[in-house]
């Protein structure tokens, strides 16, 4: 918390301690400056006052800033040693009109829990008492002053006022006498060492108060004595409080902090201000005093100042301050809500808000929404929080809506639907599985039937508009605000629930009733959400079939519920016919398409309706039922019309003949002249009359009409196809595979022409025809290519064919190999224009020439490289790794081809061709995009390149790797992330390897690869101590210190993986001889390098040591910090039936306790087996209290 732009950044923990009255300021001479001298000036003034000169010994101590030793030496050589004390007392007398502004501020800050001032000072002067005299009275100041060995014990009732640990001077105005002073080295030794009363006082003080040093430098004598005493105690006593020091940065914060950090003090640095170097300190302390005295006022000011602006314009310091201001103060969130405009603050403060519980979070959000019901940003924020939906959130929004209704009706509806959606979103899948278990076990209770249909049925879902659909400023309908839909979960575990006891005769009717009620309720919600309107019904359109059908696959929404209802229908009719008819009658009475379709489906069941009843009901149904639902219409006809009476059939056909020709008569013709009304009318009549004609003879009039339609629409002159009954038809998901029939059936000379024509097709499979043909018959495709002259117009066809050659490297048929060789020779003679156009695929063929057994033309590489150098740069973006770019580039492929050619020469025992040396050098120094890619490929195989020519590697390639530019950094990344080095290469490139490791920001496997160079070098130094390596253990350790955290974690992973590669019976020796020493040699010992990720990897490393597990635990335990994850993985110790815990129970318990002991709050399913193994192997440990605490983390599944 920074209260001045140049002032110290006060930790929030310190501010909290100040508010609790748990902080004591320990004040030095700087507090009284410049009125009184500091220790250095005091020494100079004492010498002047006494008329003495410093001896060489005294001057040596003076130059070392050991002023207490200077005065000690002086007092020893004076005849009257008291002269030193008297001279110092004279120099430190309080001025006639003292300025106590600094002391006033500190007295406001340094107070106990009940507000009494408590200051500890090593100053002899009484300026603090003078400040108390002004603020209280002279008597109070006198009473509250204590000095020397009469100081009160910290924490006691008397521990108040001004405590002079080094003594106090006389103050006649306050009637205070002088006490023994601690000024010389001998007196310091007495107070802190021989008698030790000052040391005991400070130790007790540190156990009950946080200490803030002000007015000192790190080299001041009081600081050195005090903190050396405390540091010794801190190693043995864990309850010592923190020590802070207020100090100037002097323009170099790092250098200023170092001396304090060496004394285990947290420095709070301020920057000096021109003309008033200490102004920022005292201004900050005054601001801190104002905060401590009026915390609520200051909290409110901070909140208002910070949240009135957007999160994007705030600093980390601002956010930290805001979190402190709001922390543990739910009453201030109303203040936050009234001033917050940026929704991002809720994400920024998510952890703080969550600490108050779900109910408070919901209230905060709802209150903020209510301040701007018609604000689209607030609504979109609410949508984001729907994912964490809860009943509390729903209740809070409804409550605000009731108390403060939106002015706009559309917005009110949107918010009410959102509140409803929030309640539905709180659905818990785990409860569904528990429900299934209860339903299978029985008996089934009524509430579980309700839970079942609720789980199957859809719920309202609200999503933000697509990115290119910003919400309207003045919405006229809900879709202007957000995307509303009805969605259901994938409830596969409930698919066959009707076969469980829930589907028994005594339950099935209630299930049907509850399902129908749920359907009706959710349809009304959908209507409220404007998903059902006069013209459009999204719910109906989203259900291809109300019965189980392939077209329902991948559909959600209302599909599961409607299929569940139709599946339960025949079972319910068998169990209770009259009750089922009553439910079906309810469907017909509902004003929804889906319920109408369910009623129509019920007409197909003989148990519910006679054939005449079904056909009569269909004939007299409303317009939507009769004309809109072809699938259900045809299903009724096919199931019932054959058994129906002639009269019933006649009435049905008559309605078709009367109403059919009038369909769409009121619709206007399209402007484009397409007679869609006539076509749609013909199709509606055709599908219905055709379905009827399948089972009965149509009347002549109907037959004539059907014939006319078939004549008019020749595409309808057929039987009904199933897809005719659906408004949309899905053919399923399938891979796109080029269609080659037309190409294959043509003559070779015609195939390219056909391929060109197919490429213009609207069918993607036609467009992919040539590509697929090249894959299916590459020899035939080559024949087609050869039938045309090698010209620029056919280059695209050649490119496609050439690109498939590398993927056919395993084809060994003589014909195929002949064709490739012939193609290479042909293209080797091609014009430069052709080579340039085909350089990419040709380079990849060169790269795979060995596998393809190709004899490349002598000038092949040179021509391709010349063409490659003309290629433009490729913008890959920041997401593509450097080496991924290389392997997909022409330059990278040609580099690989050249290196392979050189390797073949060496494998055959030949000297490397001089021309290839020249090519390698030419490629490396090329300042083109292809040159950059080729250099990266050479860096990937640096050890090989170095072995071929260390001159080329060092003189030409190394400068590019060492360059301080983007390419240099990318090359160093390839160097360390994709390589392993022999000793000679490591020695020559050690500095760049270390730099690459320091620069790497990779994670996971790539980070481990980078770290492996450090580990490999040090392991090798222990394995083969006589072999010189390029990276020493000291360099490896320093590099790990400077590298990213992921690199350090990667180093541990590499050690674990390599250790586990050893056979089980060799792991102990590998740990003892290699990996244990390597860890001790390279791992930083600073506590600052401990982390949760490090701790987890150290845990795994210990378990990889095999029978050396005890020794590994002993060595690694200091580096295991408490795990911080919510879910803990102890599998490395639990595997193989907790074998290590059985063999080494004490070590296993120590390791698990270090990782999972307090304050760990995670849970794990691994720990029970480990603890059981420990207890079984060593029964005495069963009563160990660590075991009891660790068992609290166990989770059983």
UniProtKB/Swiss-Prot annotation:
Instruction: State the organism named in the record.
Output: Sinorhizobium fredii (strain NBRC 101917 / NGR234)
* Keywords annotated in UniProt: Plasmid
Q: What is this protein called?
A: Uncharacterized protein y4cA
Q: Which InterPro entries match?
A: DHS-like_NAD/FAD-binding_dom (IPR029035)
């Amino acid at each position: 918390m920074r209260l001045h732009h140049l002032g110290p950044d006060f930790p929030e923990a310190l501010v909290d301690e100040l508010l609790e009255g748990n902080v004591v300021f320990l004040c030095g001479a700087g507090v009284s400056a410049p009125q009184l001298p500091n220790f250095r000036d005091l020494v100079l003034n004492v010498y002047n006052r006494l008329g003495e000169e410093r001896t060489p010994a005294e001057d040596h101590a003076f130059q070392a800033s050991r002023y207490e030793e200077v005065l000690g030496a002086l007092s020893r050589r004076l005849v009257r040693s008291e002269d030193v004390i008297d001279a110092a007392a004279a120099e430190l007398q309080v001025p006639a009109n003292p300025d106590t502004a600094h002391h006033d501020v500190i007295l406001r800050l340094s107070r106990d829990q009940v507000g009494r001032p408590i200051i500890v000072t090593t100053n002899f002067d009484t300026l603090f008492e003078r400040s108390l005299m002004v603020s209280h009275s002279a008597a109070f100041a006198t009473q509250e002053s204590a000095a020397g060995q009469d100081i009160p014990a910290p924490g006691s009732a008397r521990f108040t006022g001004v405590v002079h640990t080094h003594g106090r001077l006389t103050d006649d105005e306050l009637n205070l006498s002088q006490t023994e002073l601690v000024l010389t080295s001998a007196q310091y030794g007495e107070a802190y060492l021989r008698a030790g009363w000052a040391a005991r006082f400070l130790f007790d003080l540190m156990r009950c108060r946080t200490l803030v040093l002000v007015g000192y430098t790190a080299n001041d004598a009081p600081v050195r004595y005090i903190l050396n005493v405390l540091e010794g105690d801190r190693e043995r006593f864990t309850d010592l409080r923190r020590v802070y020091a207020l100090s100037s940065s002097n323009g170099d914060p790092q250098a200023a902090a170092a001396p304090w950090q060496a004394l285990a003090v947290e420095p709070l640095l301020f920057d000096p201000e021109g003309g008033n170097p200490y102004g920022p300190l005292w201004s900050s302390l005054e601001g801190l005093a104002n905060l401590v005295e009026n915390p609520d006022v200051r909290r409110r000011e901070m909140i208002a100042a910070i949240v009135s602006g957007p999160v994007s314009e705030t600093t980390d310091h601002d956010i930290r301050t805001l979190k402190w201001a709001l922390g543990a103060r739910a009453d201030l969130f109303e203040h936050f809500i009234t001033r917050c405009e940026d929704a991002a603050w809720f994400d920024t403060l998510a952890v703080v808000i969550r600490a108050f519980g779900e109910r408070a979070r919901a209230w905060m959000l709802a209150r903020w929404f209510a301040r701007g019901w018609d604000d689209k940003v607030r609504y979109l924020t609410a949508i984001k929080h729907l994912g964490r939906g809860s009943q509390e959130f729903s209740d809070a929004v409804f409550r605000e809506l009731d108390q403060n209704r939106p002015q706009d009706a559309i917005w009110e509806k949107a918010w009410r639907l959102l509140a409803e959606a929030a309640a539905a979103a709180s659905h818990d899948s785990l409860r569904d599985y528990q429900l299934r278990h209860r339903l299978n076990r029985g008996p089934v209770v009524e509430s579980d039937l309700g839970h079942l249909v609720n789980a199957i049925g859809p719920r309202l879902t609200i999503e933000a508009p697509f990115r290119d659909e910003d919400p309207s400023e003045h919405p006229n309908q809900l879709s202007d605000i957000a995307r509303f839909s009805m969605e259901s979960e994938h409830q596969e575990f409930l698919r066959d629930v009707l076969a469980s006891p829930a589907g028994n005769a005594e339950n099935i009717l209630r299930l049907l009733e509850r399902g129908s009620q749920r359907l009706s309720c959710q349809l009304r919600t959908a209507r409220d959400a404007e998903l059902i309107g006069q013209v459009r019904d999204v719910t109906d359109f989203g259900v291809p079939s109300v019965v189980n059908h392939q077209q329902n696959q991948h559909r959600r929404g209302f599909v599961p519920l409607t299929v569940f209802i139709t599946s339960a229908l025949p079972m319910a009719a068998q169990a209770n016919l009259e009750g089922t008819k009553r439910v079906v009658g309810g469907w017909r009475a509902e004003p929804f398409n889906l319920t109408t379709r369910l009623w129509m489906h019920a007409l197909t069941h003989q148990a519910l309706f006679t054939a005449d009843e079904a056909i009569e009901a269909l004939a007299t149904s409303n317009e939507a039922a009769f004309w809109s639902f072809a699938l259900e219409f045809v299903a009724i006809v096919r199931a019932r019309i054959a058994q129906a009476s002639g009269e019933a059939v006649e009435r049905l056909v008559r309605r078709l003949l009367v109403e059919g020709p009038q369909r769409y008569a009121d619709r206007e013709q399209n402007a484009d002249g397409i007679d869609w009304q006539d076509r749609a009318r013909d199709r509606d009549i055709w599908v219905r009359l055709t379905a009827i004609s399948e089972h009965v003879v149509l009347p002549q009039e109907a037959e004539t009409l059907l014939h006319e339609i078939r004549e008019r629409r020749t595409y309808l002159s057929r039987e009904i196809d199933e897809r005719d009954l659906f408004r949309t038809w899905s053919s399923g998901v399938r891979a796109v595979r080029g269609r080659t029939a037309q190409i294959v059936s043509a003559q070779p000379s015609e195939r390219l022409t056909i391929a060109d024509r197919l490429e213009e097709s609207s069918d993607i499979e036609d467009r992919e025809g040539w590509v697929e043909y090249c894959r299916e018959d590459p020899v035939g495709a080559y024949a087609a290519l050869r039938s045309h002259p090698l010209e620029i117009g056919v280059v695209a066809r050649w490119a496609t064919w050439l690109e498939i050659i590398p993927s056919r490297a395993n084809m060994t048929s003589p014909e195929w190999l002949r064709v490739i060789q012939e193609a290479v020779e042909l293209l080797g003679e091609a014009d430069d224009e052709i080579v340039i156009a085909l350089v990419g695929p040709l380079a990849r063929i060169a790269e795979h020439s060995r596998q393809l057994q190709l004899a490349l033309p002598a000038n092949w590489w040179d021509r391709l490289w010349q063409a490659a150098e003309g290629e433009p740069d490729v913008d890959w973006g920041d997401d593509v790794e450097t080496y991924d770019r290389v392997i997909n580039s022409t330059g990278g492929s040609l580099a690989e081809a050249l290196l392979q050619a050189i390797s073949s020469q060496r494998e055959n025992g030949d000297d490397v061709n001089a021309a290839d040396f020249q090519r390698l050098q030419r490629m490396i120094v090329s300042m083109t995009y292809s040159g950059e890619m080729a250099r990266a490929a050479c860096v990937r195989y640096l050890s090989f390149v170095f072995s071929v020519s260390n001159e080329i590697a060092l003189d030409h390639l190394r400068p590019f790797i060492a360059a301080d530019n983007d390419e240099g950094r990318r090359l160093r990344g390839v160097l360390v992330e994709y390589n392993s080095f022999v000793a000679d290469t490591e020695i020559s490139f050690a500095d760049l390897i270390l730099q690459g490791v320091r620069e790497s920001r990779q994670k996971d496997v790539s980070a481990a690869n980078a770290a492996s160079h450090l580990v490999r070098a040090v392991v090798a130094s222990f394995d083969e101590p006589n072999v010189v390596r390029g990276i020493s253990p000291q360099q490896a350790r320093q590099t790990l210190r400077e590298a990213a955290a992921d690199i350090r974690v990667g180093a541990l992973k590499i050690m674990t993986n390599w250790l586990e590669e050893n056979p089980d019976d060799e792991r102990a020796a590998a740990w003892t001889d290699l990996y244990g020493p390597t860890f001790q040699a390279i791992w930083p010992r600073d506590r600052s390098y401990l982390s949760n990720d490090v701790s987890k990897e150290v845990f795994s490393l210990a378990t990889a040591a095999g029978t050396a597990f005890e020794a590994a635990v002993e060595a690694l335990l200091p580096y295991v910090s408490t795990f911080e994850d919510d879910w803990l993985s102890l599998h490395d110790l639990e595997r193989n039936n907790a074998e290590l815990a059985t063999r080494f129970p004490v070590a296993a318990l120590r390791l698990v306790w270090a990782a999972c002991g307090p304050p760990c709050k995670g849970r794990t399913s691994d720990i029970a087996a480990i603890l059981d193994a420990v207890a079984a192997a060593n029964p005495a440990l069963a009563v160990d209290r660590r075991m009891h605490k660790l068992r609290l983390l166990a989770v059983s599944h």
